[in-house]
Regions:
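N-terminal, active-site-proximal structural segment of metallo-dependent hydrolase catalytic domains
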Residues: 6-142, 177, 202, 217-229, ...
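Metal-dependent phosphoester-hydrolase catalytic domains
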Residues: 8-10, 156, 175, 181, ...
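Acidic, glycine-anchored loop motifs typical of Ca2+
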Residues: 107, 111-124, 317, 497-505, ...
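A well-ordered secondary-structure block
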Residues: 114-197, 206
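Pro/Thr/Ser/Gly-rich low-complexity, intrinsically disordered linker/stalk tracts
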Residues: 393-422, 489-492
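Cellulosome-associated attachment modules in secreted, modular CAZymes
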Residues: 395, 436, 476, 482, ...
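Recognizes extended acidic, P/S/T-rich segments that occur
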Residues: 429-464
């Protein structure tokens, strides 16, 4: 996949800058939005949850966003009035998400009003155009993922995403039991990242484990997390081998036919409904990252290298509060987990408007028609954000020079130089020099990855009979590579070689005489004054005596 331009990066919250340190960092956001993104909710700009969530997403600009508790019209309290007091269908929620990101006319609220609060209104250069709505529901809500980059089938199972899975027992891995991923499922979406910026692609997992403190709730969360761990290890890691689900325990049909590339991480996030710091047991987050082993660093974890994966310890940048629900400082229920042998955490944080100094509010909050510190109050959870450094791509390749051919002679003084499109390219640069190592170039030109893949050298740079060297380099996040063709050369034609055969002879004299009779013609105008006259004849006579156009 070719890359799109990225917004300038910046991280300085005290100065209202909540962006990434590096534009190529990959930002993951997970957010339990407490039922507020549903088809019957009012979508007009105001002091309401819809607007509050939209300005937060616009401020954070995630590369991928997991939202849970979506589509619950009943719990949101708007379903009955609109005659749809139930969970949104996949199609209905997909339309609602498009309205949330892009605006439009609301087909689900009486009167079909225009949607006036939406993400791209508040962040016009940002978009989340690719969406997956889980087909799993507890008859209340659904999990969703929105992506800046397109979804793609990365493991050969003819799907770009799944909403859940079912496992049979595996005697070789007895830490989990047969069953599914829990009451709301656990989605995985496969994302195709730009090849010129990243060495691999990305898999985003997301879900909302069962809430509650009863023994049945605790048990369901634990067994679901153990199954999630096995699914990640078997399907995406191949249990350490090169074949997905080698023990045939996963219910994926059609079955995947390849594991992920070594530079493609799996990251999973959501509301796990337990705080690993104070739950008094090895909870669901720990199980999904560690799998069976009880000791850190063992060789059966969910990381690609079979060690343990990692999970975040995000804090509010201003208060160091780790809480993601309510006001209790020790109530972190929302987590981001990742395969740390591939994805390196740059930073993570809890995004909480209510504790920001007034000098730290992101510019997008200015669009909220109310007090900024009330924005957090419209949902009972806070967004958790993590920025990852992903593997760099290989340097570009395949940008082959096409012409003029190496060692070409008798070219005009404004030749067109061409090459083919390469792979994994962010930009090209054409260089022309009088030196074979391209040092001290007389002409350079940057070219975007989209081309054009040929450029004409401007007038006034090349001299008759001059020999010049040229090539094209291609650059991406991984580095710069000269064309595999190397450096080519060409020679400009002699000044008076009108028929371009390498000689100034009788044939050229006949052509010059014709031009001399015409007077106002460029054919014999060797001195560039606009006329073919006596001054040009003197030049021609000297060249005629030498015979070779370029002695």
């Amino acid at each position: 996949m070719s890359g799109a331009s990225l917004a300038p990066a910046q991280w300085n919250p005290a100065n209202r800058q909540w962006g990434k340190d590096d534009a190529d960092d990959y930002r993951v956001v997970t957010f339990n939005i407490q039922d507020r993104i549903c088809s019957t909710n009012l979508k007009q700009e105001g002091q309401n949850a819809w607007t509050a969530i939209a300005v937060q997403i616009a401020a954070l600009k995630p590369d991928v966003l997991v939202m849970v508790e979506c589509g619950d019209n009943n719990a949101n309290g708007t379903g009955a009035a609109q005659g749809y007091d139930t969970v949104d269908t996949v199609a209905r929620l997909t339309t609602t998400l498009n309205l949330f990101v892009h605006g439009g006319t609301d087909p689900y609220v009486a009167g079909n009003p225009a949607v006036t609060a939406y993400v791209t209104k508040y962040a016009p250069t940002f978009d989340l155009p690719y969406m997956y709505v889980s087909d799993q529901t507890d008859n209340f809500n659904r999990n969703v993922v929105l992506s800046r980059f397109p979804l793609a089938d990365l493991n050969g199972d003819a799907r770009t995403a799944i909403g859940t899975f079912t496992l049979s027992a595996d005697a070789a891995n007895p830490y989990y039991t047969a069953g599914n991923a829990g009451v709301r499922g656990f989605l995985f979406a496969e994302i195709n990242l730009p090849d010129d910026r990243y060495g691999g692609d990305f898999v985003m997992g997301g879900g909302h484990l069962k809430s509650g403190g009863a023994s049945g709730d605790l048990s369901e969360r634990l067994v679901a997390s153990q199954r999630i761990a096995y699914y990640i290890d078997a399907i995406f890691n191949g249990l350490g081998g090169n074949t997905p689900d080698p023990n045939f325990r996963c219910s994926n049909f059609p079955r995947p036919n390849k594991v992920l590339t070594a530079q493609t991480p799996v990251v999973w996030a959501g509301d796990f409904n337990e705080d690993e710091l104070n739950n008094g047991r090895d909870g669901p987050v720990l199980w999904t990252t560690r799998a069976a082993a009880t000791s850190p660093g063992a060789t059966d974890g969910t990381d690609r290298d079979r060690t343990d994966s990692s999970y975040d310890d995000s804090r509010d940048p201003f208060t160091n509060n780790r809480n993601t629900q309510g006001s209790n400082a020790n109530n972190k229920l929302d987590y981001i987990c990742w395969q740390d042998s591939i994805a390196v955490l740059r930073r993570s944080f809890v995004f909480r408007a209510s504790t920001m100094p007034s000098t730290a509010t992101p510019p997008e909050f200015a669009n909220f028609p109310g007090l900024y510190f009330n924005i957090s109050a419209f949902t009972d959870h806070r967004a958790v954000v993590a920025d990852f450094v992903l593997p760099s791509p290989l340097v570009p390749s395949g940008h082959v020079l096409t012409g003029p051919a190496d060692f070409s002679q008798n070219l005009g003084k404004q030749p067109t130089l061409g090459w083919t499109a390469g792979a994994r390219v962010s930009s090209y640069q054409l260089a022309v020099s009088t030196n074979s190592d391209l040092s001290s170039p007389i002409y350079t030109a940057p070219v975007p990855s989209s081309g054009p893949y040929s450029l004409q050298i401007p007038a006034g740079l090349l001299a008759n009979c001059g020999t010049y060297y040229w090539s094209v380099s291609a650059t991406n996040r991984g580095g710069t590579a000269l064309s595999p063709s190397g450096v080519w050369s060409f020679q400009v034609r002699g000044l008076c070689d009108i028929n371009i055969d390498g000689f100034v002879d009788d044939t050229d004299f006949v052509l010059f005489a014709t031009a001399y009779d015409l007077f106002e013609t460029p054919d014999g105008d060797f001195n560039g004054d606009g006329f073919t006259d006596d001054a040009d004849f003197v030049l021609f006579a000297n060249a005629y005596d030498a015979l070779l156009a370029c002695p």
